[in-house]
């Protein structure tokens, strides 16, 4: 009960009593929004027109030489930004195509099953991941490989055992053609290489 009384006293502290303050009550007037037409659009139109006129070259000069030279100037000023835009677009598209061709491979060495989520996010973002399970126990490594196989299957990617405890996860847009290298790692075809 003491806690309840304390809470009521605390509440009463913040609640105003009408008896303590004998202020006359005034009716609350609702403020209605008034719609007033302002000449702001006209001012903005004038600014736009002024900006447009300031960008246009002066063509009202009375000299005939200036009139013949004015169209050349206006043609050169309007044609100049176009090639710059085209060049910029070409460089941007070249940079994007270069970025699309450059692939990165992340190397991860998870220590627990929870660490494998980071590798799954990387593959989901379209990058390759090389996962080394040397710091993980066999049971957790098998569970992680099952999880990674599901992730890669969902993304239409691929998972390959590169060697021992190392697996390569690739997204759908990247293929790995390493049959010869895989056979070397597996211990086959050593007779084709001369040691001496």
UniProtKB/Swiss-Prot annotation:
Annotated Gene3D superfamilies: SepF-like protein
GO biological process: division septum assembly; FtsZ-dependent cytokinesis
Pfam families per record: SepF
Biased composition (Polar residues): 56-79
Highest taxon, organism lineage: Bacteria
Keyword Nucleotide-binding: no
InterPro entries: Cell_div_SepF, Cell_div_SepF/SepF-rel, SepF-like_sf
Cellular compartments per GO CC: cytoplasm
Region annotation (Disordered) ranges: 15-80
Cellular localisation: Cytoplasm
UniProt keyword list: Cell cycle, Cell division, Cytoplasm, Septation
Subunit structure: Homodimer. Interacts with FtsZ.
Family indicated by similarity: Belongs to the SepF family.
Known function: Cell division protein that is part of the divisome complex and is recruited early to the Z-ring. Probably stimulates Z-ring formation, perhaps through the cross-linking of FtsZ protofilaments. Its function overlaps with FtsA.
Name of the molecule in the record: Cell division protein SepF
Organism: Lactococcus lactis subsp. cremoris (strain SK11)
């Amino acid at each position: 009960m003491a806690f309840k009384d304390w809470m009521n006293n605390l509440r009463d502290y913040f609640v105003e009593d009408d008896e303590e303050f004998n202020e006359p009550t005034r009716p609350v007037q609702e403020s209605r929004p008034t719609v007033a037409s302002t000449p702001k659009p006209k001012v903005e139109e004038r600014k736009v027109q002024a900006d447009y006129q300031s960008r246009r070259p002066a063509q009202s000069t009375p000299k005939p030489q200036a009139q013949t030279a004015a169209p050349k100037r206006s043609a050169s000023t309007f044609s100049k930004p176009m090639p710059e835009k085209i060049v910029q677009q070409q460089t941007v598209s070249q940079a994007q195509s270069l970025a699309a061709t450059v692939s990165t491979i992340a190397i991860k060495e998870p220590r627990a099953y929870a660490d494998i989520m980071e590798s799954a996010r990387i593959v989901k973002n379209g990058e390759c991941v090389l996962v080394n399970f040397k710091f993980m126990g066999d049971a957790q490594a098998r569970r992680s490989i099952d999880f990674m196989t599901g992730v890669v299957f969902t993304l239409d990617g691929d998972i390959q055992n590169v060697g021992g405890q190392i697996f390569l996860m690739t997204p759908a847009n990247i293929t790995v053609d390493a049959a010869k290298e895989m056979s070397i790692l597996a211990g086959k075809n050593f007779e084709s290489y001369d040691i001496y």
